[in-house]
């Protein structure tokens, strides 16, 4: 077993340089170790869970399964729910939606998902995972979901 824990260059939601760090770490591991490409799994918690959603939906061909834990999945959904109508310019909203795991959920049709979230999470609200799991189930994706009491 080979385990990678790329940092993703800090707090960038695993986009841009953070996404590249993860992809380059996987490529380097494949180059240096005899890895079965059908047994590469992606997981992470909180910011890492956000990265797991993001990277798995953009690169589903790389993973046998994904297990996001307390991951954030869609910025506009969150801001609309918390603050009402978004004040972002239309181009910004459409840009973020084009890269949002929530709007790319269909790309996980062939990638089993095992999602976990704490019911009392105050950083990434539990409705983030609930919404994604509902969407995945509507799309008939393979998804298991567990909410953990007293976990925040």
Report residues per predicted region:
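Gly/Ser-rich "nucleophile elbow"/oxyanion-hole loop immediately N-terminal to the catalytic nucleophile
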Residues: 12-47, 52, 57-63, 107
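Short beta-strand/loop motif that positions the catalytic acidic residue
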Residues: 108, 114-117, 121
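A fold-wide structural signal in alpha/beta-hydrolase
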Residues: 1-7, 41, 65
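C-terminal catalytic histidine-bearing segment of alpha/beta-hydrolase fold enzymes
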Residues: 122, 126-152
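Residue-level signal for short, function-critical loop segments
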Residues: 9, 46, 119
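Short, solvent-exposed loop/turn and secondary-structure capping segments
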Residues: 14-19, 53-55, 66-68, 76-82, ...
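Short beta-strand immediately N-terminal to the catalytic nucleophile in serine-hydrolase-like folds
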Residues: 42-44, 69, 116
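Mobile cap/lid helix-loop segments that gate and shape the active-site cleft of serine hydrolases
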Residues: 61-111
């Amino acid at each position: 077993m080979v385990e990678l824990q790329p940092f993703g260059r800090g707090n960038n939601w695993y986009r841009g340089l953070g996404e590249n760090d993860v992809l380059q770490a996987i490529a380097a591991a494949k180059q240096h170790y005899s890895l079965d490409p059908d047994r590469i799994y992606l997981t992470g918690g909180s910011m890492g869970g956000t990265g797991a959603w993001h990277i798995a939906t953009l690169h589903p061909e790389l993973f046998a399964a994904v297990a996001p834990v307390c991951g954030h999945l869609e910025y506009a959904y969150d801001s609309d729910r918390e603050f009402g109508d978004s004040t972002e310019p239309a181009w910004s909203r459409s840009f973020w939606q084009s890269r949002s795991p929530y709007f790319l959920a269909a790309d996980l049709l062939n990638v089993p998902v095992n999602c976990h979230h704490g019911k009392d999470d105050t950083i990434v609200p539990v409705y983030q995972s609930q919404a994604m799991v509902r969407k995945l189930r509507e799309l008939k994706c393979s998804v298991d979901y567990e909410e953990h009491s007293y976990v925040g």
